[in-house]
């Protein structure tokens, strides 16, 4: 782990070896590469009714656009990390760029639900890869903090920006906002580390089994008996495969690293808590304060922005802290937020609670990612980032479902 907030991480850029040891990709390029992913997650919330109206469909039908993006980032995160690990940064970047560009063209030019779903999925696959690449190329706590802060900050403002794009251009333009990440590709390519020598052969069986497991887990909150059974079956087969292929798509060195498992599990919990709070808060505020949907949206924006922006400084400030310290700090912040929300339904208290859970999730994502990458052997950094981000994204998927179940 780094000795200061500006010192390089040991494994963050692995497996690529830096062409010039003292230089890396500027953090601003990495933040621009990663941040627009959040447009695909949160951006459609205010423009889906317009899409449903123009397409002559129900709101439930057009939500498949968002579902496709969520599924794609879940499976794309480990798949694109595997591509980076085996083929290097350049090929992974160009593949992700092609997917994002194709997806943007589909959602902008073909106003039909199948095209919109395919385009959203393509953008999800590409931006998932961009985010994993960005996090694996960070070289200090400050750069990791900037990357994760960009994800949180864009996510907090995405609904309003997408709605504005819909008013000025079209709702299809709002769905194409993840393509803004393409602006960072030339800069990252120019400063990228040298591509690695070829590693172990690609493991197609491991990739298929992990994709099946992730797909099942994504649908557990929506159809838990079937999806849960499928997840157990896929997980069992993947575990058996891991025993016979230790250097496969999911390296044994990662799943046997205690710090990696701890930080990934905590990232899941922080994401589930934060996104569960985001799901519950609008109804609580509307009921307690009698606010309109617009007033609720404007009120929630500020604690979410606070969490995203403040996380940059928190990650830098905790760069030298031991794993045990951050493992207690960020879950403690999230627990404090949940406790406040349970103790009082005052709008001010609820917004403070959201600010705490947002800060915990955004800061924890960056701080835990750095420690997860440093906990695995050389050559496994990019794969570790893919698996770590997968845990965080699964938490984001489970959080609202858990919150809905608790709410009755």
For each predicted feature, which ranges?
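Cytoplasmic-side transmembrane-helix entry/capping segments in multi-pass membrane proteins
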Residues: 90-95, 141-153, 199-208, 254-260, ...
């Amino acid at each position: 782990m780094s000795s200061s907030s500006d010192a390089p991480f040991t494994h963050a850029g692995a497996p690529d070896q830096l062409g010039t040891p003292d230089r890396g990709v500027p953090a601003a390029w990495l933040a621009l590469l990663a941040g627009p992913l959040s447009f695909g997650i949160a951006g459609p919330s205010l423009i889906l009714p317009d899409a449903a109206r123009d397409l002559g469909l129900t709101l439930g039908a057009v939500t498949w656009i968002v579902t496709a993006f969520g599924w794609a980032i879940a499976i794309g995160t480990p798949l694109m990390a595997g591509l980076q690990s085996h083929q290097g940064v350049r090929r992974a970047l160009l593949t992700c760029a092609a997917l994002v560009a194709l997806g943007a063209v589909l959602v902008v030019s073909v106003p039909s639900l199948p095209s919109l779903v395919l385009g959203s999925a393509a953008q999800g696959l590409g931006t998932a890869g961009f985010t994993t690449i960005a996090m694996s190329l960070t070289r200090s706590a400050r750069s990791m903090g900037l990357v994760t802060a960009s994800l949180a900050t864009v996510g907090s403002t995405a609904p309003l920006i997408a709605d504005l794009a819909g008013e000025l251009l079209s709702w299809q333009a709002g769905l194409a906002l993840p393509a803004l990440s393409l602006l960072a590709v030339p800069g990252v390519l120019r400063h990228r580390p040298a591509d690695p020598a070829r590693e172990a052969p690609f493991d197609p069986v491991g990739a298929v089994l992990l994709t099946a497991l992730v797909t099942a887990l994504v649908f557990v909150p929506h159809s838990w008996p079937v999806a849960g059974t499928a997840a157990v079956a896929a997980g069992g087969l993947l575990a058996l495969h891991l025993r016979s292929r230790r250097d496969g798509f999911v390296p044994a060195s990662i799943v046997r690293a205690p710090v990696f498992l701890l930080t990934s599990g905590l990232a899941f919990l922080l994401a589930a808590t934060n996104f569960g709070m985001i799901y519950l808060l609008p109804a609580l505020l509307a009921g307690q304060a009698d606010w309109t949907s617009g007033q609720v949206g404007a009120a929630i924006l500020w604690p979410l922005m606070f969490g995203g922006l403040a996380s940059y400084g928190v990650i830098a400030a905790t760069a030298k802290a031991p794993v045990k310290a951050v493992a207690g700090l960020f879950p403690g912040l999230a627990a404090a937020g949940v406790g406040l929300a349970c103790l009082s339904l005052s709008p001010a208290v609820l917004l403070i609670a959201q600010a705490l859970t947002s800060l915990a999730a955004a800061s924890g994502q960056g701080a835990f990612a750095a420690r997860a990458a440093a906990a695995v052997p050389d050559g496994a950094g990019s794969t570790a980032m893919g698996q770590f981000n997968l845990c965080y994204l699964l938490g984001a998927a489970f959080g609202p479902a858990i919150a809905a179940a608790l709410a009755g």
